[in-house]
Amino acid sequence: MARKTHRPDDILWTVTAVDIDAVLSQKYAKQKLSNNGRDVFSSSRGISSSNQDMSSGDLEHTGEACDISLGEVLDTKYPRKSLVKLFEEKLIHINGHKATPKDAISVDDEIWIAMAKEKIDHDPIEMDLSVLYEDEDLFIVDKPSGVTVNSKDQLSLANGVAHYFKDHGIKRKVRFLNRLDRDTTGCIVIAKSGLAQSLYQQQMDDNTFEKWYMATVEGIVEADEDSLVFPMERSADGIHYEVNAKGKETRTDFSVLCRHASQSVDNSVNKFKNSVDIGLKNVDIELVDVDKNNPNVDKTVYKFNKCGYSEVLVRLYTGKTHQIRVAFSYIGHPLVGDTLYGAQPTGQPFQLRAQKVVFTHMRTGERITVTA
């Protein structure tokens, strides 16, 4: 039996003239496109041919007189695949009554999209989660290093999120909108419903859902900023990825935050800092003296690094596995500690953090920034 009361996570909104105009604009554009520019939409509405150059915003509407359907209005707001499922499950209502896509709609009608309860799809295991953001549709946490996002064979972040949902009465599946490698830290975004997943995935596909990273790479990156566009695919060994003409195109933009020319040998002796100009900008240089005759110094661990390192801010436009790691390795600047892609061993995880995400709130239209 369908429920009659609203829950906090349901979607409620009242149809406005703007919603009607959005449908008319869409119809107007489609008609012009399908008729090689001949404006049959305007003429079918009784608008004289002398006014056929008017914009769709000039078209008048009078609520029901426009003959606008619920399906047409929702189609301007939500992915069609999600709408089909919501209508099949009878979760969409007009003025409190179950609705179909063909139902007529007018200004001031109330639309109610009920969010169905779901069974949690991962074993709930308590974890110390660092929650960065939460609303009715999204849940964003700061993933620590050394934890996988989702794994059937071992404890993963999905188990911790499932426990949080259960503990807070959130009867939802765990839907990850992004993934991070085990050693990558920072923003992990989880959708609380299929509709939210579809809407925010659409933003990711359109690159209006921004994903920003901080990385430390080997060597002095000369360009202040650049866009790395390479085709990538999984290598023959099945372990890592590589730039390959047969792969899918990826885009990784970056800007250099700072550059360091460093000689790091042993932190225990005669360390001092200085500032030098290496031709790009003034950077910190760290010099270390060491007793080369000391048998306790591991010369393989404390290898002299003439190249230094750079800290970069990265924006990811595509979401290929290991994309940032592959891109910087390909240009000769692997992430510090990323031995899989050619970096010197440091004994520490590679330096990559999902620093922030920026997106448009699916209910309010507000731009939201979440920083880890």
Locations of the language-model features?
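RNA pseudouridine synthases
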Residues: 1-372
